[in-house]
Amino acid sequence: MAVQGFQRRLLGSLNSTPTAIPQLGLAANQTGARCLEVSIPDGLFLSLGLVSLVENVLVVATIAKNRNLHSPTYCFICCLALSDLLVSGGNVLETVVILLLEASALAARAAVVQPLDNVIDVITCSSMVSSLCFLGAIAVDRYVSIFYALRYHSIVTLPRARQAIAAIWVASVLFSTLFIAYYDHAAVLLCLVVFFLAMLVXMAVLYVHMLARACQHAQGIARLHKRQRPLHQGFGLKGAVTLTILLGIFFLCWGPFFLHLTLIVLCPQHPTCSCIFKNFNLFLTLIICNAIIDPLIYAFRRQELRRTLKEGLTCSW
């Protein structure tokens, strides 16, 4: 395979020299043609990773501290934050080790680096898969709370939520282990791509259905109070914008990475695909950006969580 889904960069760093200053420019691909390559500075990548780590640690600590936040909804949000934390942590750890190896500040043998690389890859991959799963779980939780409001607490119970969380983590680790072990098999990569597309479609269908129900509810309230039609139109427009932002961020941050995996299967030697492969680190950076955005969308917008976080920060000072 021309390009691996998860590059084995640690082993390659044992005998490498420090890279030049990253830049945006044209690079030659395998056929000698010119293509656009976006290189991400290590400092920027590490900074984004640290921001994500801090944000998601705050979310996990806040939910763990307040017993009022130990509901199924917040459990899913907490696990999403934990997954994003591991995504960022795995990439930051790998980057730091690579930089130390390149600077000859860390002496290591291939026999030691290989298992470390495998462990980091499994952690990163499993946290990516679990992050997608918990995004879907949050969407399902919201859907049930809207369409089955009266039976929500009997349907989405804490024991069931814990069982779902355990199943997601176990499945993510098992699948990621297989993915890392058989990364050069097209079927494994296609399974991961199909999983992403299924999650995207499921989230889009659920949120569009929720938006339609919300618009119907707003229209009913407007008729009850004999309000004007523009109010309903404004609500629908606001909901559509929110939905577009939510799904747009999800697709923008995750789509390029899974496009990368798809092209590995479809055209591993094609010049155009080779140009796209050169931007793998950019695709990882977009996933880190998603780990930064997730707490802003799913956690910090909730008043109870913000209040608990504010109290915790105030007491710490």
Curated annotation (Swiss-Prot):
GO CC terms: plasma membrane
Location of the protein in the cell: Cell membrane
InterPro entries, per database record: GPCR_Rhodpsn, GPCR_Rhodpsn_7TM, Melcrt_ACTH_rcpt, MSH_rcpt
Glycan-linked positions: N29
Protein topology in the membrane: Multi-pass membrane protein
Extracellular side: 1-37, 94-118, 184-191, 267-279
Molecular function GO labels: melanocyte-stimulating hormone receptor activity
Keywords: Cell membrane, G-protein coupled receptor, Glycoprotein, Lipoprotein, Membrane, Palmitate, Receptor, Transducer, Transmembrane, Transmembrane helix
UniProt record, GO biological process: adenylate cyclase-activating G protein-coupled receptor signaling pathway
Cytoplasmic side: 64-72, 141-163, 212-240, 301-317
Lipid attachment residues per UniProt (S-palmitoyl cysteine): C315
Spans through the membrane: 38-63, 73-93, 119-140, 164-183, 192-211, 241-266, 280-300
Known role: Receptor for MSH (alpha, beta and gamma) and ACTH. The activity of this receptor is mediated by G proteins which activate adenylate cyclase. Mediates melanogenesis, the production of eumelanin (black/brown) and phaeomelanin (red/yellow), via regulation of cAMP signaling in melanocytes.
Protein family according to the UniProt entry: Belongs to the G-protein coupled receptor 1 family.
Subunit record text: Interacts with MGRN1, but does not undergo MGRN1-mediated ubiquitination; this interaction competes with GNAS-binding and thus inhibits agonist-induced cAMP production. Interacts with OPN3; the interaction results in a decrease in MC1R-mediated cAMP signaling and ultimately a decrease in melanin production in melanocytes.
Database matches in PANTHER family: G-PROTEIN COUPLED RECEPTOR
Entry protein name: Melanocyte-stimulating hormone receptor
Taxonomic source organism: Hylobates muelleri (Mueller's Bornean gibbon)
